[in-house]
Structure formats: C-alpha cells, structure tokens
C-alpha cells in the first residue's frame, strides 16, 4: 500500500493545523494512519517513510514524532528537504506499508 504525502491538515476541514513542527508531523502521521486503517493496516505495517520538509533543515522534531508513533524496529526513512509543499505546509509524510 502506497500512501501519498500527507500534509498536517485537519481531515474534516482540510485546513493546515497550527502548532510546532512536531505537532504538525504528528498530524501527518495521524493522516497516514487514517488512510492505512481504511485497508485494515496500521503503522506497524509501514516498511518505509519519506519525510518532506520545507523551509528548514531541522528534522529532529519530525524524528521525535516518528519515534513516538512507530513501533520498533522503526521503518526505513528518507528525509528530503524541498522548496515547498502544497498550501505552504512545512512538512509532509508518505509511507509504504505491507503485510
């Protein structure tokens, strides 16, 4: 299952959530988890994530959010600094999951 990049958007309104970079990364992970649950998958099934970060090269906040949410062993992770993300989001996370 390929989950396309999830921005830190409220699933009800589509508006970006406010907060720290870690809080925004957590919302991205909430959105990834919601997509996975539609196919009866969980974050435990994720084998690879790609983190897109715009406007900063401080990946530590995103790493902290991922460490809190993913079980061990953590999935493989690529971190990519980009010029921009849709709606001006500072972070987006995509995932690959399988059973």
Model-identified regions with their sequence ranges:
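Short, polar/acidic, helix-capping and beta-turn segments at strand->helix junctions
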Residues: 1-99
């Amino acid at each position: 299952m390929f989950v396309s990049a999830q921005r830190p958007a409220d699933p009800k309104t589509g508006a970006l959530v406010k907060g720290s970079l870690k809080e925004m990364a957590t919302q991205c992970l909430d959105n990834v988890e919601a997509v996975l649950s539609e196919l009866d998958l969980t974050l435990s099934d994720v084998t690879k994530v790609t983190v897109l970060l715009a406007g900063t090269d401080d990946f530590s906040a995103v790493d902290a959010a991922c460490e809190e949410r993913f079980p061990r062993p953590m999935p493989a992770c690529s971190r990519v600094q980009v010029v921009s993300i849709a709606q001006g989001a500072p972070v987006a996370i995509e995932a690959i999951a399988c059973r």
